[in-house]
From Swiss-Prot:
Gene assigned in the entry: dnaJ
CXXCXGXG motif repeats: 150-157, 167-174, 189-196, 203-210
Chief localization: cytoplasm
TM helices/strands, residue ranges: none
Its job: Participates actively in the response to hyperosmotic and heat shock by preventing the aggregation of stress-denatured proteins and by disaggregating proteins, also in an autonomous, DnaK-independent fashion. Unfolded proteins bind initially to DnaJ; upon interaction with the DnaJ-bound protein, DnaK hydrolyzes its bound ATP, resulting in the formation of a stable complex. GrpE releases ADP from DnaK; ATP binding to DnaK triggers the release of the substrate protein, thus completing the reaction cycle.
Protein name: Chaperone protein DnaJ
Signal peptide: none
Family: Belongs to the DnaJ family.
């Protein structure tokens, strides 16, 4: 049976980053680990397949060979075909096992007298906050998965009245030696799946896992200035490790709700501000909202629609910034609506007055007319 593509096994694209590859492997390893699926041959095969894929794609040299030549590029039996050192990885590990037998130490990979320990998988929690909370900081409580020792078996995985025994196949080592011709290899024990333990009667409540999933409340402190998509790490609050391995971490990913007034651009803020025709023409003081209260700035006379004003220091002080950003106010001149006949007549008189005597009171209109005249001349 032909091997599956390593990227397909992990469920990632060929342009996946090292972090994405690692996350995909951890997710599959926790899902299909033999300790969690003691009676499933299919899960065991998928675990081995994911482990092999990760070992190849997490090694830059092996990954480069695989990307160029496929499975043949990392097959130790075809090492001479491509002239790359990465092709000899399998043989180097085999010789490492031989030297380990002679000198009491391994030449590559994991060696040791106990079962393999695995770090727990990381967890991700998505949280949505307001722009004000992002700017000023926020404290929140979240509910996340938690694993407690099983109260039925007290965490050892065995049904009360029975006991956990040392694996009779690997004698507690978690690994067994397998001879292949002149070479001696180590592989995960097929009976205990690397735990070094054997449970004749698994706990009926936790099914031999020793832990039960529950929920717990965590306090999360969101720093002032946090931006969209940033993550906060809570060490040790991920899934528990396997065989004594350390727990994973919890990552709280922050998303910011759209704001009714402001749009954020890094540490800067932008807002659209409507102003009257009279204010734009005559000038005046304009009061605008900010995240820290109201601010006033002067609007000069003859201000055109679309003009942008910059208020320094009225933006957000980012988590990595030493000073706050700016607030950009984009003014839009509003055309008056629902006018009375008297008001309309006043505007007609005003319009006639500004066009009398050749005075140029509308710079954009005049510029446009000049362009049209030159076009037809």
């Amino acid at each position: 049976m032909a091997k599956r593509d390593y990227y397909e096994v992990l469920g990632v694209g060929k342009n996946a980053s090292d972090d994405e590859i690692k996350k995909a492997y951890r997710k599959l390893a926790m899902k299909f680990h033999p300790d969690r699926n003691p009676d499933s041959k299919d899960a065991e095969e998928k675990f081995k397949e994911a482990k092999e894929a990760y070992e190849m794609l997490s090694d830059p040299e092996k990954k480069a060979a695989y990307d160029q030549y496929g499975h043949a590029g990392v097959d130790p039996n075809m090492a001479g075909g491509f002239g790359g050192a990465q092709g000899y990885g399998g043989f180097a590990e085999a010789f490492g096992d031989i030297f380990g037998d002679i000198f009491g130490q391994g030449g590559g990979g994991r060696r040791g007298g106990g079962p393999q320990a695995y770090r727990g998988a990381d967890l991700r929690y998505s949280m949505e906050i307001s722009l004000e909370q992002a700017a000023h900081g926020h404290e929140a409580q979240i509910r996340v998965p938690h694993w407690d020792d099983c109260d039925h078996c007290h965490g050892n995985g065995a049904e009360p009245g029975s006991s956990v025994e040392t694996c009779p196949t690997c004698h507690g080592a978690g690994q067994v030696r397998v001879s292949q011709g002149f070479f001696t290899m180590q592989q995960t024990c097929p009976k205990c799946h690397g735990s070094g333990k054997f449970i004749p009667k698994p706990c009926t409540k936790c099914h031999g896992q020793g832990k039960l999933k529950s929920q717990k409340t965590l306090e999360v402190k969101i720093p002032a200035g946090i931006d969209e998509g940033m993550r906060i790490r809570s060490s040790g609050n991920g899934e528990p490790g396997i065989n004594g391995g350390p727990p994973g971490d919890l990552y709280v990913e922050v998303h910011i709700k759209p704001h009714a007034v402001f749009e954020r651009d890094g540490d800067d803020l932008h807002c659209q501000m409507p102003i009257s025709f009279a204010t734009a023409a005559l000038g005046g003081d304009l009061e605008v909202p900010t995240l820290s209260g109201k601010a006033t700035f002067p609007v000069p006379e003859a201000t055109q629609s679309g003009k942008t004003f910059r208020l320094r220091g009225k933006g957000i002080k980012g988590v990595r910034s030493g000073y706050p950003g700016d607030l950009y106010v984009h003014v839009n001149v509003e055309t008056p609506v629902k006018l009375t006949e008297a008001q309309k007549e006043m505007l007609r008189q005003f319009d006639r007055s500004v066009h009398e005597g050749g005075s140029r009171h509308s710079p954009q209109e005049t510029s446009w007319l000049d362009k049209v005249k030159s076009f037809f001349s």
